[in-house]
Amino acid sequence: MLAVTACGGGSEQGSGSGDGKGKDSTAARSTQSEARVTIAPRDGAKSVETSGELKVTAARGKLTEVVVKNAKGKAVEGAISKDGASWTPSTHLAASTAYTVHAVAEDAEGRTTTQDSRFTTLTPKETFIGHFTPEDGSTVGVGMPFSLNFTRGITKPDDVEKAIRITTVPAVEVEGHWFGNDRLDFRPRTYWKAGTKVTVELNLDGVEGRDGVYGEQSKKVSFTIGRSQISVVDAKKHTMKVIRDGKVIKKIKVTTGAPGYETWNGKMVISEKLTVTRMNGETVGYGGEYDIKDVPHAMRLSTSGTFIHGNYWGGDAFGNRNASHGCVGLRDVKGG
């Protein structure tokens, strides 16, 4: 009886104590989320690649928030997948930069869990930049592209092009075109509309342009499209029409490339203006055929040496015959 009583008394106390622990444990389980968050790279990682390594995933739940920032508070753009299972960045990361990651996930019962992490991206041994035109704050013509000349040949053009964002007011579709592996131009399919405001964001810092070679530019450039002025040269008729805002305002007699030195066809943009310059045939593969030290009013049309320029030595060629080595010549006087 004593034994039974003792057992009975112990069971009741234990039962009371046991129920208490059971309730506490159940309560804890009811508030703790079953969702689990995993962040890659690991917390504290260093020399992390700027592309491909950052990813956040959730198990037994869905991600509801992911914020990745650098030390200055600038957020990394990214998106949570439709099923809530993962988050990936939509762009590369900057090089030599410390980042923090804050992620939140919830389970089927709506209970949340959070995970925080830090890491630092790699410091490149080799880098590249893009020299660009037009300059920030400039006003340019309706045919002017935004042109980048890179200091290293680019073997990952899609990644580099993706890192350049162009916005315009009014909105217009702008396309990129590569010339070889070191030049990239952006322009609309037709001429710009006069008055268009163009903003270019160069987010090249950290983008891998070729194996082991990373961009180092992070810059914003803005320029404005001025009035519409287009000059149309007819090499057969030896004339040039100047069209401003859709109206012909002037017709000029010209001379273009002689037989064997024909002027290139197509649309070309004036990219440089020189009051006076020297033109030497040696620089374009024409040997000693000419060396004119004071060519007036020279305007560059191509990187290969095609210009439209003043000409004081052409005699009666203007409007009558083509006599140049490929340039478009207009009657001018010595010294401009």
Regions found by a protein language model. Name each.
Residues 154-157, 208-210, 239, 260, ...:
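Short beta-strands and strand-coil junctions in structured, solvent-facing domains, enriched
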Residues 65-67, 157-159, 240-242, 263, ...:
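Short, solvent-exposed loop/turn elements at domain surfaces
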Residues 1-227, 254:
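Acidic, low-complexity Ser/Thr/Gly/Pro-rich repeat segments typical of extracellular/periplasmic
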Residues 219-260:
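A structural motif detector for short, solvent-exposed N-terminal "entry" segments of globular domains
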Residues 177-179, 193, 223-225, 232-235, ...:
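Extracellular/periplasmic catalytic domains that process cell-envelope and extracellular macromolecules
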Residues 120-129, 142-143, 258-261, 265, ...:
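Post-signal peptide N-terminal regions of Sec-secreted extracellular proteins
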